[in-house]
Amino acid sequence: MNFTNYVEEKKKEARIKNIEILRKEIDSFDVREKIKNHVMAFEGIMSEEEVREGILNNLIIASKFCKEPSKQNISENLAAEVLGLKKLPTSGKNCIRFNDKGEIVRTSSGNTKSADFILGEYYATQKYTDGMGGAQDNQRNDVIDFLKRGSINYKVAAIVDGAYWDKYRPILKKEFENNPNVLITSVTEITENIKE
């Protein structure tokens, strides 16, 4: 299975659904506030009613106001579904994070991002990144931090997919090749290995 293609197809479906939801909720407080703020940002060159009608009748305008699928944990949910894994909590007493000593901690301040899954004997972080740039490099740094700190005392994995990781996954594997506590893979690799 090519997980990148699967995610992109599901994101398209989510965009269509998100536009439908936006249009159904056009008169809700949240949508009205978005419209009002947009009109105010453009200092009255359009009215709230014009924007409202645009959302209802113009796909391009609606697409600018609907929720963005990348902010809805779609890839994480799809990875869980495809791999048959249960998502770990991102906060609270069952959250898994690592401090500078490689110890499991529950608080976010000064510690790694939380583990997303348990993959066999590994605490795993999962990322899907489809573009290049600064925000994506921040995600890469989060993954490296998770692997470095977590591997001090535990087995940790990075499940990384998308165009960005197609480029950086081999570099990451090279960086951690001598660390027996680190696994770097992708949903695509895992599903292909299951078939064999």
Question: Model-derived features: where do they sit?
Answer:
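A short mid-domain helix/strand-loop element embedded in enzyme catalytic domains
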Residues: 48-58, 89-96, 120-123
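Conserved catalytic cores of phosphodiester-cleaving nucleases, focusing on short active-site segments
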Residues: 117-130
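Active-site metal-binding core of divalent-cation-utilizing nuclease and nuclease-like domains
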Residues: 89-119
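Catalytic cores of nucleic-acid endonucleases
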Residues: 128-175
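Nuclease-adjacent, charged terminal/linker segments that flank catalytic cores
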Residues: 1-74
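Short, well-structured alpha-helical interface segments that form or flank functional binding sites
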Residues: 70, 74, 78, 112, ...
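Charged, structured surface patches that assemble and position nucleic-acid processing machinery
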Residues: 171-196
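Extracellular-facing segments of soluble proteins and assemblies that are Gly/Ser/Thr-biased and enriched
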Residues: 62-101
